[in-house]
């Protein structure tokens, strides 16, 4: 029974009014949309038959409304089509009061918890004491219990768990498997560095260049040069990182935004579903500094970090120190790439004679640093320092190779600055050229070297004071505020080579010139002609720009002058932080109609449509990639004398723009349609093109491993982000030195176990060991996929049978529920601990309904994750899956449902859990405050298209996508089924699937008759999976009570991934897995929920416009729903769009990436819960251990 039925009566059941009233917020005003033809008119019809006056078809729009205090308008009870008529009978009404597994557990736990009132009172006193002093709790709580159970602990036969102080940390080993330099690669390097054909390559070494970031690349040593080259991460369209952050300001203490880091732009949005309207965008090319704020007392990192620009300072608050560090690392990488790279690469070229000093220092194990100092210019005597890190011990070989080649140059008559070479000093004076050898004369540009006496070089070994004063440089080449052009890179490289003869090519003059140019451009951008602009705004005529995408005629009356074109493009790029790839095609003055019309300017570029408000006090910006636009069309104006253009966006509500002239509206429509035709023509996928602007991070396990690796080296004291070289000839991957042991713990039905099997197979492919811990009935299912299995007690079917026997709540039922639940949970606790303790897992992932994992992880002191299919995290966006109201009640209610469920759930199990913790685990008693459940990393195996991450989700809460377990490759369909499908297709009939699982209803025969009547009236063919019956576990449930007509086939269980692509619509109970399978196949979905999270997913399917939520099921309501699901084109198209989005998700890979990303954070959360040791003599202060001291795993860079 859902917890809703504990506190209120369900609409589907007769009963008194709720005894507990959860006061909703004030209802919000319904949204009004203009009436228009084509798609919009169909959409308005679609909204009406869905029974909502204010529900938008845009994905995630309802969530944004729910984040506000005002809830959406409730679903209408009066339905035009009649399939949700409250006066109709519900033949699928459950016969029994208790209907949900989680509801069963919760309800039974309440009854069992009533017997532990005295223990709860004691624990509530602990709660109040904890709020005053957590330290006193740590010292006092649980000591008496540990002492009293000391003898019992000694008699336990469980193996001892190795404590953290006894685990030996493994140092990191690095190696890179690379191919030998081919002739093509050598030729490319010669071209890149402008090397002579007669200058051979001597050696190459993998190395890391240490700047603000640690850049992985390669060192090449030739006969005359020291070269470093690195490919920076490519794919500028991908989102590097996204998540929620709080921005602190002076006026407003803190505001929470959805933040997206993409290429050189760091953008903030109001929610994860409104990604075309940034609230703030920071250009990382203009950022001067990024730093984590430190504690003033101990200097440790905080959750706050800052971004400094020339104009302002931005202060951000993350959800944890780990999250703040992750954001800082990601931002520093993109800042470095934006400010220091050209063509996605970094190159460094130093003539060997300019090298002054080479110093190597060991770090840990084989790793060492190599400091290289080189003279930059004879005019300034500036010396550049370059620091390289070698992880495989090759740094000493680099030093040796450089020393040998410098000695060869010295012997050949070339004066060098390297003081370690015992060579004769040149007799020629400083500043004159050394006589060149024949080889040098042939080499042209490399034949001139600075003739500097080695005594002039500052050295610790040189006893005499130098006559020359060298000025230290801070590597300005890497710290330029603007990206370098190719010519500038070359100038910088030439400084090391011919600085004495080419003073005009110095770094200083180059930067100085560009600073002047930038300031001039900004001055031009902010000197508009006010009278002219006012006239243009009043006339509202189109403005065309010369471009190579949409050619305009020379006599075009709207074509702008060439003298104004450059400044217009510069202003456009300045406003929206674009690079030079963006070029304007046309601009218009218009109104953007959302909630309130906003006057501004719309910009059309080669691949983007942008809007900027022009009204004082308004700060509306829009950046819409054209690849996300489906089409656009003309519409009548909302006001007299105005003309509307409607832009239709994939998976988003339409945008309406009002123009004061018909000419401007028609002109932009023509240009947009032409650009869309060009985009679709250039892609083989046509309208399937998608944009990374939708904010979906491309989760790559290698990137996640890199983040974990960064966390570990940060713990070693190296707080610097890593940038992996993406050289196609040197493939880099990160793998653990040891295989992790994953324990996946879950209880429930097949739908709860199946996603864990899919995740387990993915982890095994990563090289880890996986054990699934669940009930014995799933042993064959788990082991058939090659995954190890461990059995535990706690099968909820035992409790369900008790609820089935009692149709109403009575004293007998309460007593039996209490006694059986206590024994049930005792067995679950004990068997789960025995398995996990014996297996010695490294990481534990648990379904939170299993209740035991968080305590076992604390006892074993291992990272702990939660994974589930329904809302379990406190949020204002969604109610708890077991307390879904009949109408939307707003954010306050949603948040309250989570708090209520947590307290009710814990109240029922806390007595037994605390006793088990003390007697078996050797831990102290705990409570909700000490458990820190909201800080546990959480993985939702649901698609973000149906469950968009809420703006108030913490950084460690990830919506990964579905974990599909594909069985279609091994399934062989029966001939009867194939013939039935062929018959339906040959007759042109729609084919639907109907199945509700193994539910218990009041009258199974009447329900079957109603289903047959509905299928006949809808005139469709039906593949039936009958599982309903009047008794739990009825063996005859699969058989039909009535004769089925020819157009209905009862086939039983068929893999959804095979069957659903064969049908046109699906009708089911709304379980997470079944809903995911139907949406994955692009099917309009009709859901008749029965219990638990099924009500939640029924509402979500209806919210995003791909299905219908049936309140009651009978012949008429089901027939009406089937007609709509099989004939409505808008719903079919919407379902097809969802299919495309889900097909591009990889839930398993994203989940594995999230595990790597949050592994160190999960470990820290577990350690923070450790309050008392398992045994008194093993008193280990685990809270003081560093992450490096609490792990025994290592990682290898391959």
Curated annotation (Swiss-Prot):
Domain GRAM: 187-236, 570-636
Provenance organism: Saccharomyces cerevisiae (strain YJM789) (Baker's yeast)
Composition skew (Low complexity), residue ranges: 52-67
Basic and acidic residues compositional bias, start-end: 146-162
Main subcellular localisation: cytoplasm
Membrane topology designation: Peripheral membrane protein
Protein name as catalogued: Sterol 3-beta-glucosyltransferase
PH domain residues: 238-336
Upper classification of the organism: Eukaryota, Fungi, Dikarya, Ascomycota, Saccharomycotina
